[in-house]
C-alpha cells in the first residue's frame, strides 16, 4: 500500500512549468471546497467495486481493498469561471494529495442547446510534478465520451477547459508541448450521457494505476489498469470556463464530490446475479466489526471480543538523519562512460538520501522490477547501503540477464544474486553521449600482453568462457627443453621469475624422434587433457569478475620488442562482442542491491516528511529510519548504544528501543495498551453495549476512539459504554454474560420507556442464577450424602529435603584400562570390535546428560530464585534480604500498647507497675474517682486484691481515717476499717504478683531447657543428613576405586599381570589367558558403565524433581498437600549443597478437624444441578453451605463457588475385575533337558569369580528427618504459656499548692514582660502601630491635645 504525502518544493509552487497564458488571471476568488452534508453510505454498495475477473454468487465475503471510510464526507472540487481565473484555484486545498486514491461522485450536467444534448462535467488531472519528466493521467469528457490519457505532459501553470454547450471567450488550454508527448495510454470510453451521476474509483498499488467507473448502480466496474512504475502524489479538478449568462437561465451547475481512499476491509454481499447488494466497512463502527467478525449482516445475540476501535495514536514520531547529502545515483547511472559485462562496475552508496521517483524520471527507464523485495516498500525506507552495479547490454545476450539464467552473461561475466533483496533496472542513454569502456580485468591476462580491445565505440565485449590459473602460471615453454624437439616444436620464451614453464615432454615414435608433447593442446577450451592443462574452466561467482580469458599457449613466446614470454592478441580465446545500440540508444543494465533493509541511514526521501518532536507517555505512530509501528516512548538512561547504533531489538526482531541522533536521548518503546473490548449485542439492535475491561472511563475517553455515547460509567470489570448502571437489580437468566457475576440485560424500547423512561436499551445488572433460600427449600443431593473431616486448626511445621541433581563426570580410556601399554593385548582387543567405542560413547552421553541436567537446574534457579548460602530455620533471622518480621507481626509486651501525650507526661508524675490481670480492671472501675477505691476491690483466684500504689490524696484520706480512729476510741473505731482493708488488700496484691512471677520463672527455665535439647537434636539430625550428602559424593569415588581394583583381579587367568602371562606361556596359550583377562576387565567395565547409566537415571529424575520443586515450592505456593514439606505449603527456601539442592519447607498441618456431611452436588427443582468449585457442599442445621476443601469456613452458596450442570443424573462406571497372571509356568526339569543336549559331553567350567565392589549409594535421610520433625514438634510444645503480667501506667496529680505556685509565677512573668515592652525603647515601634495604646511622656503633646480636641 502506498501512503504518499508529497510536498511541493518552493521552486514548484505552481502547477506545471510553462505559462500558457497570462491574461485575465487574478487572486480575488477565495472560494474553498464545499463539504457535503451527505456522508458515504456504503450499505447499498457506494464506494465499492467489482474485483477484476472474479464473480461471486449468493455469498457474503470479506474483501480487503481500497475503499472510502464509511460515514466520511465529500468535498466539492468543481470550479466554474467565466473570464477570469484565480491563482488560488491551483493551490491547496484544491491541489490535493492523491495518496492511495480517491472516490468521485460527479454530477452529469445535461443541457439542451439548439436541440442538442450536451453532457458536461469537470476534467480531473492526477500526477506528481506535472511536467514532461513524469506521467500525468487526464480524464476529460468530450462529446459524450471519456478521453483518458497517460502522457508526459507539460502542464500549463493555470490549466482550464471550456464549456461546449455555451462556449467561452477563453480558449481551452491545459498543456503545451513542442512535439507529441510520450504517452503510455490513450483510449476513449463511452458513458451514459443520460445518467444523473457518474462514479469514479481511482487508486494506485505497487506502481499500478487502477480506474473503475459506474453510471448505473452504486458499485463501480473495471475500466483499465496501467503500470507506471512511479508514484502519483497529487490531483486537482481543472476549472471549467463558460460565457456569462443571466442567472435566471443559467441552470448549469457543476459538482465534483471527492473523498479519499484507504486500504480497508469490507464485508460484501452478492446476490444470485453477482451484484453487490450490501456492504459494511469493518472498521467504521462497533456493530460493523461484529458483522465482519461473524460475516453476517444480522449477527446473533452474544458477547463478542473486538480488536478494532482501541488504540488512537495521538501523534507521529518521524526520524531521519538530518542534512545528509544526496546520493546522486542518477549522475553515476547517466555517466557517458559505460563498462562492458566483462569489466562491469560497482558503486556503493551509504549515509545519503535518494529519491527513487526522481531517479526513475531522470533515467530513461525501460523497466524496473525487484526480487525478494516489494518495490513499493523502497519509498520511504532506509538501508545500510545500496550497492549498484552496471554494464552495457550486448543485444544478442539480453535474455541472459533473466533471473536464474545460465547464459554467458551470468556464467562468465556477472552473476545476479537471486537470494538478495535487489531490483533490476533496464535503461538507455542517447547514442551520441555513450562511450563503451572495454577493458580486460584479469591481471594474469594483462601480464602476458592482453589488456584492451580494439573495437568500435559501441561494441560491447563479453566472455564466453572463463579460466583460472595458479599464481605461478606461465604459458611459454622452456627454451632449454624445446630446443631438442625435432617436430611440433612449440614457441618458447623466458618466463617471469617465480613462475613455472609450460609442461612439455620429449617423445619418440616409430617414425619421429624427439617429438614434443605439450599441455593444453590444441587450446584450453577443447583440450585433449583437461586434467593436465593448468588453465581450468570456471564459472563466476556473485560479486566476482571473470578471472581471465583462455590463452592458446601455442601462440605465446618471444615477440617483437619482447624477449620474455608474450602472447599475441589472437592467442586469447573465449570472448565475443556485440553492439548495445537500439533505436539510437545504448541499452544498459543496472542491479540495485539493498543491504540492511530498515536498519541504516541510506534513506529514500520520496515522502519528504520533516523530523518531529518525540511525544512520551502516549500512544504514537512512529517511523524510525523506515521502520514503522505504534508504541509508547519512554525516556530511559542507556549506555549500551554504540556511536553507529540507534535501534534496539529483542530476540524476536521487534524494535524495543531507540536512540535519537538529534537530541542524543534514549527511549524504550512500549506497546500501546488498548485493553480488551467486549461488545454485548442483542440481535436486531442498532448498536452494542461495550465493556473496556480493566480500563477507567477517563482513560477510554482520552486515549481510545469510540462512538460517543451518553451513558458510560466505571464498573468492577472496567469502563461500560452505552448501558445504564443497575447493579442493584439482579436477573436469574442472562444471554449476555460479562463475567464475575455481571450481565448485560436488554429491554425492548417500548417496555423500557414505560418502566424507566431511559434512552439506552442495555442495562448493566447483577447475574444471580439461583436464589440461595430457594435452593435450601427444594434441594436434593446428587450422588449421595457422605461424612468427611475438614481441618479447623493448624500448626506450622518445617521440613528439610535434599535432592541430588549432579555427580562427578567420569571418562575412561578403555584400551589403556584393559591392556595398559602391551601391544599383544591391544591386538587381541581390536578383535572385540567397537566395544571400547561404545563404552566411551555411553560415558559421553552420561556426561552430556549431566551438563543438560545442570543447565536445566541452573535455568530454573536463575529465574526469580535467591540462593542462600547461610540458611537458618530460625524464623527470627533474615535470609538473604528476606525479612520475616513483617510476616511475624507484632511480638512482645509492647503490642497494642498506647501512651499519653508529651504534655501529659510533663504535667503529671508517671508510675509503672506490674499487672497480673486486676490493675487495669480496677482502673476501669474507678474511672479516675479515687473515692471509689474500696468499692472497686478486684478478685484474683478468690483473693481480694488492690493495686499496691496510692496517690497523695488516697494516702491523706486513709491517714486521716486512721488518726481519727485512734483519737476517739471506741466511738471512732469504725473510721479505721477502710484503712485496715486498704492495707490488707494491697498486701494481697503484692503476694499474688510475686507468686505469678515465681511460676513464670519456673516455666521459662523448663521451656528453655527443653528448647535447647530440641535445638541440639535438630542440629544433630541436620549434621547427620549433611554427612549422608557427603557420603553420596564419596560413593562416586569409591565406585571408581572399586573399578580400578578390578585391574588386579585375575578373572580365572593365571595372573593379572600381562607381562607374567607372556613370560610363562607360549603365544597361543598366552592369547587364551589374555583373552580371559580382557573378558573379565570388559565385564567389570561394562558393569561400571551400567551402574553409571542407572545412577544418571536417578540423578536426572532427581534434577527434574528439583526443578519442579523450585518452580512450584520456591517460586510460588504449591496447592498440593505434602509435596512441599508435610502439610499445606506456606513457603520454601533453597540453597546449594554438594551435588544437589537443599530445600527447607514450611507448611501448616491440621491439628483438629470437624466432621460434616457433604454431597458431591445438589439438584435444584429436579432439573438443574450444581457442583462445588474447589470445595464441598456441607449440610449444616438443615441448610446447605459451601466450604473450602482445606479449611472449614462455611459461606453461602453463590455463582462464584459452583459449577452448573445440565442435569442431575450421575454416571457411574464400574471398574473391571482384572488380575495379573501370577502363575508360574510348568517347565521341564533343567537337568533332564540339559542332558538331551550334552550327552557324553564333559567340560570343566573355569572359575570366573568376579569380586565386584561397585555400589550405588542412595540417600536415606528418613531417620534424620524424623528427628528434625520431632525436634520441631518439641519446639512447638515448648511454648511458654506465661501468666500475663501487664504493665500499667498511672498518673498522679500534683497537690493544690504546686498549681498555685505555677499560676503566681506565670502572672509575674507576664507583668515583667509588659513593663519591659512599655518602659524601654524596644517596643516603641510596635506600640506606635497599635494607635498609642501606651502614652509616651515627652515630645508629642500637641498630637495628644489635638486628638483630645477632635474628640
Swiss-Prot record:
Q: Which SUPFAM superfamilies match?
A: Coronavirus S2 glycoprotein, SARS receptor-binding domain-like
What is the gene name?
S
- Provide an example Pfam family for this protein: bCoV_S1_N
Leader peptide range in chain numbering: 1-12
UniProt protein name: Spike glycoprotein
Please list the GO terms describing molecular function: identical protein binding
Name residues in a coiled coil: 1030-1074, 1257-1285
**What coarse category fits the chief subcellular location reported for this protein?**
virion
Disulfide bond positions? 20-156, 151-183, 163-242, 282-292, 327-352, 370-423, 382-603, 925-936
Extracellular-side positions: 13-1295
Q: How is it modified after translation?
A: Specific enzymatic cleavages in vivo yield mature proteins. The precursor is processed into S1 and S2 by host cell furin or another cellular protease to yield the mature S1 and S2 proteins. Additionally, a second cleavage leads to the release of a fusion peptide after viral attachment to host cell receptor.
